[in-house]
From Swiss-Prot:
Pfam families: TPR_3. It comes from Yersinia pseudotuberculosis serotype I (strain IP32953). This is Low calcium response locus protein H. The gene is lcrH. The lineage of its organism: Bacteria, Pseudomonadati, Pseudomonadota, Gammaproteobacteria, Enterobacterales. Mediates the negative regulation of the lcrGVH operon by ATP or calcium. Acts as a modulator of the yop operon expression. SUPFAM superfamilies: TPR-like.
Length: 168
């Protein structure tokens, strides 16, 4: 019994060391990057087809298999957002933002979720961050336009709420 406990502890320490050293579950199971890409394509296509629950399952598995690929968390967050699971989507986007701090889509989509929850100040903060990350990146021109529109809408909503308080 003592030997089993020692073996289990050694295994846990080895696993922890492997993961902390940049290892992934996919590496442990010898799942190739090609296989991960095929799974990503499957999940992406399911999402694009409106099969959010199916895509969610695949993105969730991908996040477990390779917790370093921020695309997987963007996809997971998008599925959760599409299914109305805003808090879970925000968690996915937050984790992805930690993985890729220069990716403006994470704070943007988190802001969309926050708006759905009626949390204007928090959403505005996320949009400002997205706007800052976009800064003169032509590949995000469309996103930049959306961010600007949403910031303007929040500003107008705040002004209207302020007027209602001042003039009941």
């Amino acid at each position: 019994m003592q030997q089993e406990t020692t073996d289990t502890q050694e295994y846990q320490l080895a696993m922890e060391s492997f993961l902390k050293g940049g290892g992934t579950i996919a590496m442990l199971n010898e799942i190739s990057s090609d296989t991960l890409e095929q799974l990503y394509s499957l999940a992406f296509n399911q999402y694009q087809s409106g099969k959010y629950e199916d895509a969610h399952k695949v993105f969730q598995a991908l996040c477990v298999l390779d917790h370093y690929d921020s695309r997987f968390f963007l996809g997971l967050g998008a599925c959760r957002q599409a299914m109305g699971q805003y808090d879970l989507a925000i968690h996915s986007y937050s984790y992805g933002a930690i993985m890729d701090i220069k990716e403006p889509r994470f704070p943007f989509h988190a802001a969309e979720c926050l708006l759905q929850k009626g949390e204007l100040a928090e959403a505005e903060s996320g949009l400002f961050l997205a706007q800052e990350l976009i800064a003169d990146k032509p590949e995000f021109k469309e996103l930049s336009t959306r961010v600007s529109s949403m910031l303007e809408a929040i500003k107008l909503k705040k002004e209207m709420e302020h007027e209602c308080v001042d003039n009941p």
